[in-house]
């Protein structure tokens, strides 16, 4: 199984599609945002400044993102494929990702771009809500995703 990279604007459904692919093909869904949150939650000394950067609206450096990704991709569960959500975000990350693939002896990835009209994207972002009890994400503007 090849690995899959999902690229799309915010609220286009990367997470939703990744979850469906993950369940169907039994490959892990890797989100760079989740990797960062995990490091912050573990109070890892090496990544102690991450929360401050995020709080100040500063993008996390490519070096840190690539280091976290390389660590995650070296796990055994990625050897048969994985889904990358929200990565790469720039050309440098794409080139470095190719090097990581070679270094870890992983297959090349299939890239899927999810298109979304800007008006719909804005409506999805503004209507996005998280259930405080079950943590399910839904949208108050779209009936198919509203809570039952």
Each language-model region and where it sits:
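Glycine-rich phosphate-binding loop of ATP-dependent small-molecule kinases
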Residues: 1-148
